[in-house]
Amino acid sequence: MATYFVGDLQGCYDELQLLLERVDFNPTQDKLYLVGDLVARGDKSLECLRFVKSLGNAAQTVLGNHDLHLIATALDIKKVKPRDRVDAIFNAPDFDEQIHWLRHQPLLVHSEELNFLMSHAGISPDWDLKTAKSCAAEVEQILQHGDFHYLIENMYSEQPDRWSPDLQGLARHRYIINAFTRMRFCYLDHRFDFACKSPLKDAPAELTPWFNLDNPLYKQIPIVFGHWASLVDEPTPKGIYALDTGCVWNNRMTMLRWEDKQFFTQSAVKNYSDF
């Protein structure tokens, strides 16, 4: 039995299958964890959704920002982004089933047995483990069982950009969603910056990656995340695993076998910018 993590798919189905073949993935014995953004700019988003869903308990994903945007478009809250290739999802006979399944995926996965935390973008520098788990559960409860339409309709905001336990209502839920699905750089006072998406060497001096801020949790439990393709080949602190290596940007897809921390990579098999 082996445990695998894989970076953002973004509709890059062929590369995922090549990686699974390479490691001889067996869904009756092995487990696949995905860091979110199953869909978007690649040409096989529907295949990615169907495949991960078909694995049942052999796979677990978390919600990424592109996954949430797909749900928003399915609810007629947002329009499909011009670069997203998701028409096949909207035309599929199992469209409602796929969106329902996606909406019921978590923002955070914590395994005590395997000793890891996984989310799409990371863990807020102001949260301990208890806070991270309770915040994720708050929003998951609404997405799965509450007024999810109202939440998704009102989640698009960059404020508040700093955590406070006194945050309530939509402000609180926006921060939680942004922390788990959009966070990259922060100011030293832990405020989020959503404008900068550049490689670390090109970032303004006042900004630092969230994982370089002082949070004891970052050293207590290994954290697996995706979302940040420009981190490719950048060193990260011990126990911080950045798995988005920009396959949809014509780079590569990365898989991590947890038991021995061995990485496997698959170069993009097509030029996605040509579509």
Swiss-Prot record:
Disulfide bonds: none annotated. It catalyses: P(1),P(4)-bis(5'-adenosyl) tetraphosphate + H2O = 2 ADP + 2 H(+). SUPFAM superfamilies: Metallo-dependent phosphatases. Keywords: Hydrolase. The keyword rRNA-binding does not apply. One of its GO terms (molecular function) is bis(5'-nucleosyl)-tetraphosphatase (symmetrical) activity. Its EC number is 3.6.1.41. Gene3D superfamilies: 3.60.21.10. Pfam families: Metallophos. Belongs to the Ap4A hydrolase family. Hydrolyzes diadenosine 5',5'''-P1,P4-tetraphosphate to yield ADP. This is Bis(5'-nucleosyl)-tetraphosphatase, symmetrical. The gene is apaH.
